[in-house]
Every structure is written in structure tokens, then in C-alpha cells.
Design a protein with these regions (language model features):
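Residue(s) in the substrate-gating loop at a strand-loop-helix junction
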Residues: 41
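Short C-terminal tail/terminal secondary-structure segment
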Residues: 46, 133-134, 145-159
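Short, small/polar-rich loop/turn modules that mediate ligand/substrate recognition or access, typified
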Residues: 73, 78, 144-146
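Active-site loop immediately N-terminal to the catalytic Tyr-X3-Lys motif
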Residues: 46-52, 74-75, 121, 139
């Protein structure tokens, strides 16, 4: 674990949420309401071996979401978080490659192991996350706040 990796990950994954929210809240209050959607991860629910800074930053986003939902509800501002599971694409491919290297296994085996941790046995697509976000900002979700919504095919563990 390198200090530089820790600082960079916290800056990107956690501080960016703080700064965005700090500047968005006055606009939402002026507008008499709205919706904030934070992006966390299932790593923020389970932890994630070999990705400590990432998991810590995503746990913190859940805390921010819960706290802000309590603070901003009186202003008709809803705050929720989406926790995607493993998302198909370059990023998960890099994670699979790194884990395969660290344990001396093939990438195919590691990918199969990752998929085995998910009840639906598949990774999430970006569109799945977008669909949840669309729902959370809609009028149909007008009474949903302070919730941590997983879009993960039912990830049961991360190891």
C-alpha cells in the first residue's frame, strides 16, 4: 500500500463527492429540492482485498450519503447512492489481470471466480447503472432517500 495511491484514490473517489455536493447544495436549496446520487461500490459494502484505498473511499461515500440524506431532507433534497458490482469493461479487466498475477492464476479463472460471487453469474453493464440513476431522479422515486441501491446481480462476497 503506497501513500501516493491512498491519496490519489481518496482525492478522486471521496473528495470529488464532497466538492460536488458542497457546490450543488445551494443550487438545490434555491430550486427547492432535487436529487443527489453518489456513486459508491459493492466494495463499499464488503471490502475488497488488494484494493484497500478503493474500498475505504467507497465505504466513506455510503456514510456521506446517509448523513446528507438526514441533513437535506427538510429542503426536499433526496440523497442516495448506487453501489455497482463489477462493471464490464477495461477497469474490471485490469483488476482481473492484477489479481491473476498476484495469485499466479489465469485471467480466465479469476474472471470465472469473480462471476461465481454473483448470483446472476455476470458483470453489470453501464446501462444498468444509468437505469438506476434515471429511476432515482424520477418522480417515481420521490420518497426514496438515504438508500444504498446495489446494481450488482446480487454480489454475495468479494474475495
Amino acid at each position: 500500500l503506497k501513500i501516493e495511491d491512498w491519496k490519489e484514490t481518496i482525492d478522486i473517489n471521496l473528495n470529488s463527492h464532497f466538492y460536488f455536493t458542497k457546490f450543488a447544495i445551494p443550487l438545490l436549496k434555491k430550486n427547492k429540492g432535487g436529487s443527489i446520487i453518489n456513486l459508491s461500490s459493492t466494495a463499499g459494502l464488503f471490502g475488497f482485498p488488494l484494493r484497500t484505498p478503493y474500498a475505504a473511499s467507497k465505504w466513506a461515500i455510503i456514510g456521506i450519503t446517509k448523513s446528507l440524506a438526514m441533513e437535506l431532507g427538510e429542503f426536499n433534497i433526496r440523497v442516495n447512492a448506487i453501489c455497482p458490482g463489477s462493471v464490464s469493461g477495461d477497469r474490471i479487466n485490469r483488476v482481473i489481470e492484477a489479481k491473476a498475477k498476484s495469485i499466479g492464476s489465469s485471467e480466465k479463472e479469476v474472471k470465472e471466480d469473480f462471476e461465481a460471487m454473483v448470483s446472476l453469474k455476470t458483470f453489470v453493464d453501464k446501462e444498468d447503472i444509468a437505469n438506476m440513476a434515471s429511476f432515482l431522479i424520477s418522480n417515481e422515486a420521490s420518497k426514496i432517500s438515504g438508500q444504498i441501491m446495489t446494481v450488482d446481480g446480487n454480489t454475495e462476497r468479494m474475495d
